[in-house]
C-alpha cells in the first residue's frame, strides 16, 4: 500500500516543541493559531498530490517515501516526461510527429540501478493516471517478466486511483492485459519478446531488457530473433505518433540497440540515447569525472571496480 502522510488533527493541543508560534512577514507579525495547523497540513497534502500528478519522481516519492533517487533517475525522468508530453501533443494535434525527437529513446544502464522500477513500473502508472486514453505495451525478454510488470503496474494503479481520479476496470484481473473504467479497451498490454501482441496500437511501448544476460546475448540466433520481432511485431503495433523506449543493459554490440542504431545510420528511425555506465568513461551525460560511480549512494567506485575485476 502507498505510504502517504496523513493529516492529523492537533486541535486543542499545545504546539509541538520546535514549532513556531508566530509567522513573520516583513515588519508585520501575525499570531499562528494552533487550530490552523490541520488546515495547513491539509494544504501541504494537496500540494504534494498536485506535484505528484505533474511530475514522475514526485509521484514515485509520494507513493513510496523510502524511494532513493539518484541523479541518473532525474535525467531519465526528465526524458520520460518529454516523451509522453510529445505523444500527447501529437495526439491532440499540437505537434507533428516529424517535429519530435523524443519518440525513439534508448536508455543504457547497468543492472540493479533502478531502471525497471522507474521506466516499466512507475512511469506507465503515472502516465496512464494522467492520460487514461493511452495504450501501453510492456515487454521484456520473457513473458513471465513482462506479466510481472503488468501485475505490478495494475496493483500500483489500484493504490493510485484516488490520486488520479480513475478506477480499474472490473475485468482487470489479467496481469498481461488490463485497463481503466471507460478507457474503451485501452490500457496495459504485456508480452515477452518474440510473443504475439494484439489489440489497439500502443501510444508508448517499453522494451525492458530484450535479452536476458551475456550468455544469451552471445547467441546470434537470439539477437536476430529479438531484432526481427521488433521489426515485424512491436513496431507494427504502434499507434500513429507512438513512442518506443528501449531500456537495457548492453551485453553485445550487435544486440537490438546496436542493430537499430546501425539502421539509423542508414536513414531509419532516429534514436535519442542516454548512455549511463556504472563507472563514467570519457564524456558523460551526467557530467561525471572518469571513473565516477553512477549511483554512489548505493554502489560506490570501490565496490564497482571489485565487481569489474571479478
Label each residue range with its predicted role:
Residues 215-310:
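Non-catalytic, compositionally simple segments
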